[in-house]
């Protein structure tokens, strides 16, 4: 984290040396881009260069800022008036409003500021604050007084250069009255004083703004702090993170004090300068002025740990702010100061907590980063396999080559999506890693690869597009022929981009081509250009990689940074006004690519500016990009439209400077919301989409494709659900916010409504339609406040942004959300920005367009966001407003307790605002505005990145719970406010995990658009949030719901099953296939009886007899007993099986039974097993339960209950009552998780049967008595030995009983023989009909049997197998008689 700050030069300039007077901007090279840029540049330069001393950096920055502000005051004062009345006509205004600055009323111009980009506004505020703090009172006043210059800056070119300062000036031009500070407050104070007044609903929004700004300030401070830390002196770098934090905090306090002193003099010195700003702010919203002061201070203050620093910084900012307020004027200032103090205290507490949580996170972060390294390497290995060309591919036919490249592109798209997703996750993790400076080599390596991957994507897209174009030209009837249309409709075609793509290795080249493409259409071409850009930027729905080459191309542009984006801005410039701003830009800072203001009215500047960023950004941004992406993403949301313009210049500056510079500038932007946001928007978008390419696309990409992007967004919107997921994984996170707007079906695709703005409709109205929906999720809560401020804007939902940019803010935010989201998500930041820019251009007349994005931008429409979110692997880096709680890593409970605002521990202002939000709709709205402001802050400051990272870490652990709780709260508020939130929530969840991530917040966003917008603002977090929100979304209710259940569970009775449901139909049809019933009960309670009943019932209904394992069987022994033989009357010893209980053997037997039980389970022969044992102790049957469960059996516990006395009488094993009582006293209750079997119905059935049996008992007894009598009579006749042949009454037995056969063997005389023969030959009367019975022997006569057989066969008429006709036809019986002579051998 600290390295990150260092990287962001911006933070370094913020540190201790804030006192330096405001000499002309000289020191920083980056100052050249423009005053605004100088401020941003100053930070960047220090960080980028050999870390100038903070004091030197401050001095240089202050000088530059002063110069810039002076120019701005001159220009803004005049243009300011112009802009409000004539939106497009006043060039200055246009410049300032860039299409949004000029919005209808002065408020509109302010909205332009916001429209410019909430980030820019914030940046502007930061600049103002910095100047004020640093002693550039003039600077602030300048911003306020000289919006004209600001307008020039807004042209998109200048602003970006000023990164943060210029953007603020921009807003001033349009809404100078509000105050330069107000620009920072984009949402609350987008418009001039008038707008500010509209924001008054926002002014609470104003207060909120102040508060929000404070968070923003803290964010800026964090960034500043980060810059200070990273860029600062070697000492901090050598310190441990905690030491650094303490060191930076001390430095911050020191610098804040110095700045306060300087500030006061500055205000006194230049009432026009510093004081001017405060006054306007105070007039419109004293809060803003204070906010401004606090913001810069805050930006400065949070040097080290975003959370910690943030907490302390707010206090310092508050002090300066209060001083400023007092100097400026207003008791309101004092009130705000107190508020800020409270917030600062809260932040300090949060910071302390954050510090504690920080180190634990670092270990996990490092592991996560290493895992990402491994996954990225695996993807690269796959990439090596995919990107292989046949050496003779050039010689092959057009069709073959086209198919080859299409197939390769298709394969690469999936790979690229995986890469983007993993890279963004890696980037997020890296940026959240406090010691990322130790991983710079890794970062360079992966960013180089990121550029290479994007270049490949662009290259393949270009190849496919070129072949398709050629083929379509030949075929003439190809749908592809119109590249623009295809581009807008299909991400694959990116003819425009091809040039950039052509240098696959060089993403920047790709970017520049995009620029030219964009450049061609200054105002008209924009639509075409956007298509090409969109081509590079696949529709949100389509993953960048999916969208053929273009998306990839866009990513490279992202690397190139502003290369492509600038192009897009030109489209936005369609209105002349944007161009006007350009001149100021060039005057302020004729950045590398930005032509003089005279250039194509903003188009050249944009193009130029973007182009340099493209190349520079590409290189420097790749390493840094991740970080930027994290921070910028929110910013870009906040100020996508403006950001696109400024980002390019900023990118240029960044490009000119090393990545560090870019980051530093970005941080500068972070400090000055506007610029940071723009950079973030530009960079972040790429990062999100491309991971490394965030910076370049930032402005240009988002802007470039605006026109086509609108179309594309529509197409992508359609595709979003299908293809976006892939892309969502990589790009969506950053772009998700931009994309989400278009993504959600809820709002027309950004392109959908956007195209009209380019046509000339005010983007506000056109964009707004979509924006309001998207925003509605966010602003809904806040709409009241914002809505009043922006009467002009038809879409009041965005009003929260309107705080500063009333309608414009709304529109712009919406559009910005869409664009930023879209662009970010798309990886073609151009597209998002471009469409936004287009809208801005179209909206130039209506400032509203620009304003919407600034604050709310950071919170893109929740709906769209989801789509973008998935791509955002970095989502976590993005510090989503939703993550307010995440930052502090508070326990879930704590999170629940903490209101939305409080949740955002890391952000100074958020807590109070959030609380307000919780408090009521209006409050929520205000909070929403603040959040928006804050969001941009978070977006812009690198610190925010840290916050996001830390938050992400926390999110990973605590965030889930907290998110659930918070989300639940949000959902609850949303539901109360408007049911729509839930739908949004689910919509986002369904739509995108990323959005879902943000989902928790996003859902609320829908409801409380104002609240959530900030959250959406940071896409990175959104991405991460996406993940959590999903959890959150589902969990929110559960979080509350689940907690109670645990208690009830404990009280809840064990689950029970009725035995009839298992044994009787229809229950037995659906019962488990394998069942084990464990009987337990006292001896004599009827266990064995019930086991038999169960067995019998199972058999009764057709089941196999269950296996009954009874412990009693083990106690049955063979015993010899003397019994009296009934026959002989003698005493005979017989072996009998009897039950003999041996307590010593019980355990042994139980073990043996367990083995048998396991064997039975393993055999699987018995699907129904019954265990019959006392089982008075749980340990006796627990192992049986576990073993059965392991084998997939459903185990039921059948507990017998009976009175001890009854058991003593009934038990057949002779157990004494004393034993039974003792057993009952020590009876153990079965575990609750074991299913009980209710056997009462079985016993009832048995009882009924017994009753029936009793009815028949009388008869049965009578029958028994009769039998006994018969037996007695029989025995009286004499003893008759029984044989097995005499089992029942048979003739033989009767003959014997009759004495006919008694002495057969003794009579050997012939008479006896003869008599016997006669008797023997005498046929029984029933011989013919007698049937043989099994087990019984009877006499048969062969001839008679033969005759019977013949008769039977004759009746049948044939014999199966072989028919013996002789036998059948023999009626005389001669054949049968022969049978008597047959000899049968046995």
Curated annotation (Swiss-Prot):
InterPro entries: P-loop_NTPase, YLP_motif_con_p1. Residues 320-333 have a biased composition (Acidic residues). GO terms for molecular function: DNA-binding transcription repressor activity, RNA polymerase II-specific. There is a cross-link at residues 894, 951 (Glycyl lysine isopeptide (Lys-Gly) (interchain with G-Cter in SUMO2)). It is found in: Nucleus; Nucleus speckle. Residues 1-336, 517-1068 are annotated as: Disordered. It comes from the Eukaryota. Pfam families: AAA_33. Residues 1336-1343 are annotated as: Involved in interaction with PPP1CA. Residues 260-270 have a biased composition (Basic residues). Residues 31-50, 59-80, 762-779 have a biased composition (Low complexity). The modification N6-methyllysine is found at residue 683. Keywords: Isopeptide bond, Methylation, Nucleus, Repressor, Transcription, Transcription regulation, Ubl conjugation. Residues 276-285, 706-722, 904-938, 945-1014, 1023-1033, 1049-1068 have a biased composition (Basic and acidic residues). Its main location: nucleus. Interacts with PPP1CA and NCOA5. Forms a complex with ILF2, ILF3, KHDRBS1, RBMX, NCOA5 and PPP1CA. Plays a role in the reduction of telomerase activity during differentiation of embryonic stem cells by binding to the core promoter of TERT and controlling its down-regulation. This is YLP motif-containing protein 1.
């Amino acid at each position: 984290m600290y390295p990150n700050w260092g990287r962001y030069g911006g933070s370094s300039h913020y540190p201790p040396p804030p006192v330096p007077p405001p000499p002309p901007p000289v020191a920083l090279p980056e100052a050249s881009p423009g005053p605004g840029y100088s401020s941003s540049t100053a930070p960047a330069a220090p960080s980028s260069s050999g870390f100038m001393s903070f004091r030197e950096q401050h001095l240089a920055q202050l000088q530059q800022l002063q110069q810039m502000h002076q120019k701005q005051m001159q220009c803004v004062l005049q243009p300011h008036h112009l802009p409000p009345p004539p939106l497009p006509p006043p060039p200055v205004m246009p410049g300032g409003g860039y299409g949004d600055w000029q919005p209808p009323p002065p408020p509109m111009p302010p909205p332009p500021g916001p429209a410019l980009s909430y980030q820019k506004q914030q940046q502007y505020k930061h600049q103002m604050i910095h100047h004020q703090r640093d002693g550039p009172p003039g600077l602030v006043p300048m911003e306020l007084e000289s919006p004209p210059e600001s307008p020039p800056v807004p042209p998109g070119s200048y602003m970006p250069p000023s990164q943060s300062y210029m953007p603020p000036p921009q807003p001033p031009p349009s809404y100078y009255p509000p105050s330069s500070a107000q620009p920072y407050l984009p949402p609350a104070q987008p418009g001039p004083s008038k707008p500010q007044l509209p924001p008054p609903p926002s002014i609470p929004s104003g207060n909120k703004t102040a508060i929000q700004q404070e968070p923003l300030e803290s964010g800026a401070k964090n960034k500043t702090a980060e810059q200070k830390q990273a860029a600062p002196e070697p000492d901090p770098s050598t310190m441990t993170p905690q030491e650094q934090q303490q060191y930076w905090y001390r430095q911050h306090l020191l610098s804040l004090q110095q700045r306060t002193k300087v500030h006061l003099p500055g205000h006194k010195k230049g009432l026009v300068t510093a004081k001017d700003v405060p006054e306007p702010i105070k007039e419109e919203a004293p809060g803003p002025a204070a906010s401004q002061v606090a913001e810069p201070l805050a930006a400065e203050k949070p040097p080290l740990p975003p959370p910690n620093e943030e907490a302390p910084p707010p206090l310092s900012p508050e002090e300066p702010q209060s001083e400023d307020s007092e100097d400026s004027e207003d008791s309101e200032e004092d009130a705000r100061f107190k508020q800020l103090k409270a917030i600062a205290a809260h932040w300090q507490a949060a910071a302390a907590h954050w510090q504690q949580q920080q180190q634990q996170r670092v270990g996990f972060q490092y592991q996560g980063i290493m895992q990402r390294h491994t996954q990225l390497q695996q993807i690269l290995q796959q990439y090596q396999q995919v990107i292989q060309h046949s050496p003779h591919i050039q010689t092959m036919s057009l069709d073959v080559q086209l198919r080859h490249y299409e197939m390769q592109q298709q394969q690469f798209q999936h790979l690229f999506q995986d890469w983007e997703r993993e890279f963004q996750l890696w980037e997020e993790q890296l940026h959240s890693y406090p010691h990322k400076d130790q991983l710079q080599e890794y970062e360079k390596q992966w960013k180089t690869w990121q550029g290479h991957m994007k270049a490949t994507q662009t290259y393949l897209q270009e190849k496919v597009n070129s072949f398709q174009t050629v083929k379509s030209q030949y075929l003439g009837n190809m749908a592809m022929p119109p590249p623009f249309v295809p581009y807008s409709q299909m991400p694959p075609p990116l003819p425009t981009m091809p040039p950039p793509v052509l240098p696959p290795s060089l993403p920047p080249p790709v970017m520049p081509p995009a620029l030219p493409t964009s450049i061609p259409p200054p105002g008209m071409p924009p639509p075409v250009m956007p298509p090409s850009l969109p081509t590079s930027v696949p529709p949100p729905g389509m993953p960048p990689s999916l969208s053929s080459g273009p998306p990839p191309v866009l990513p490279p542009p992202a690397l190139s940074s502003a290369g492509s984006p600038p192009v897009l801005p030109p489209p936005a410039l369609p209105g002349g006004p944007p161009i006007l701003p350009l001149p100021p830009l060039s005057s302020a800072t004729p950045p590398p690519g930005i032509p003089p203001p005279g250039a194509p009215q903003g188009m050249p500047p944009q193009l130029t500016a973007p182009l340099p960023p493209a190349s520079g950004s590409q290189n420097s941004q790749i390493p840094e990009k991740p970080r930027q992406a994290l921070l910028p993403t929110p910013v870009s949301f906040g100020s996508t439209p403006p950001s696109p313009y400024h980002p390019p210049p900023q990118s240029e500056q960044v490009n000119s400077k090393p990545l560090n510079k870019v980051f530093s500038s970005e941080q500068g932007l972070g400090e000055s919301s506007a610029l940071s946001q723009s950079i973030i928007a530009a960079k972040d978008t790429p990062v999100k989409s491309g991971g490394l390419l965030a910076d370049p696309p930032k402005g240009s990409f988002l802007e470039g494709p605006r026109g086509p992007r609108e179309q594309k967004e529509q197409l992508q919107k359609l595709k979003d659900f299908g293809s976006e997921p892939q892309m969502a994984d990589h790009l969506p996170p950053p772009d998700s916010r931009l994309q989400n707007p278009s993504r959600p079906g809820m709002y027309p695709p950004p392109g959908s409504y956007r195209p009209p703005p380019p046509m000339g409709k005010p983007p506000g109205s056109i964009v707004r339609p979509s924006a309001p929906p998207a925003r509605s999720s966010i602003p809904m809560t806040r709409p009241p406040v914002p809505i009043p401020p922006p009467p002009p804007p038809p879409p009041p939902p965005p009003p929260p942004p309107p705080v500063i940019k009333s309608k414009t803010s709304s529109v712009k935010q919406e559009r910005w959300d869409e664009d930023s989201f879209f662009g970010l998500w798309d990886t073609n930041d151009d597209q998002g920005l471009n469409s936004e820019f287009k809208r801005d251009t179209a909206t130039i007349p209506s400032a509203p367009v620009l304003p919407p994005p600034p604050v709310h931008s950071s919170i893109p429409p929740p709906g769209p966001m989801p789509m973008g979110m998935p791509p955002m692997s970095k989502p976590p880096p993005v510090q989503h407003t939703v993550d307010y709680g995440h930052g502090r890593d508070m326990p879930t409970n704590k999170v629940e307790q903490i209101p939305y605002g409080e949740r955002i521990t890391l952000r100074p202002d958020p807590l109070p605002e959030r609380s307000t939000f919780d408090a009521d709709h209006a409050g929520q709205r205000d909070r929403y505005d603040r959040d928006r402001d804050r969001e941009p802050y978070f977006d812009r400051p690198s610190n925010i990145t840290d916050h996001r990272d830390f938050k992400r870490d926390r999110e990973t652990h605590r965030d889930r719970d907290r998110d659930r709780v918070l989300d639940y709260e949000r959902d609850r508020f949303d539901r109360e406010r408007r049911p729509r939130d839930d739908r949004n929530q689910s919509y986002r969840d369904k739509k995108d995990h990323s959005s879902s991530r943000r989902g928790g917040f996003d859902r609320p966003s829908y409801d409380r658009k104002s609240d959530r917008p900030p959250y959406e603002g940071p896409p990175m977090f959104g991405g991460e949030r996406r993940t959590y929100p999903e959890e959150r979304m589902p969990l929110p209710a559960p979080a509350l719901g689940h907690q109670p259940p645990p208690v009830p569970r404990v009280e809840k009775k064990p689950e029970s099953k009725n035995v009839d449901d298992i044994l009787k139909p229809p229950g037995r049809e659906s019962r488990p296939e394998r069942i084990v019933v464990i009987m337990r009960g006292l001896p004599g309670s009827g266990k064995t009886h019930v086991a038999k009943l169960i067995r019998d019932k199972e058999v009764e209904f057709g089941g196999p007899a269950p296996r009954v394992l009874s412990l009693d069987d083990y106690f049955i022994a063979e015993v010899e007993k003397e019994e009296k033989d009934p026959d002989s009357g003698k005493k005979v010893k017989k072996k009998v099986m009897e039950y003999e209980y041996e307590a010593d053997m019980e355990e042994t037997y139980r073990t043996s039974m367990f083995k048998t039980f396991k064997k039975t389970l393993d055999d699987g022969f018995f699907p129904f097993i019954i265990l019959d044992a006392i089982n008075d102790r749980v340990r006796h049957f627990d192992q049986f339960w576990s073993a059965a469960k392991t084998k997939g059996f459903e185990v039921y516990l059948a507990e017998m209950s009976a009175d001890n006395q009854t058991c003593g009488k009934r038990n057949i094993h002779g157990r004494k009552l004393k034993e039974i009582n003792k057993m009952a006293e020590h009876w153990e209750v079965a575990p609750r998780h074991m299913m009980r079997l209710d056997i009462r119905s079985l016993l009832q059935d048995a009882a009924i049967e017994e009753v029936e049996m009793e009815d028949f008992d009388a008869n049965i007894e009578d029958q028994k008595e009769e039998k006994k009598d018969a037996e007695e009579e029989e025995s009286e006749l004499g003893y008759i030995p029984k044989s097995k042949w005499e089992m029942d009454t048979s003739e033989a037995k009767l003959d014997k009983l009759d004495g006919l056969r008694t002495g057969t063997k003794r009579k050997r005389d012939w008479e006896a023989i003869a008599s016997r023969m006669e008797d023997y030959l005498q046929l029984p009367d029933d011989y013919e009909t007698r049937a043989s019975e099994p087990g019984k022997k009877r006499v048969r006569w062969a001839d008679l049997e033969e005759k019977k057989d013949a008769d039977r066969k004759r009746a049948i008429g044939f014999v199966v197998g072989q028919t013996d006709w002789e036998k059948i036809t023999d009626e005389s019986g001669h054949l049968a008689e022969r049978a008597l002579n047959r000899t049968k051998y046995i």
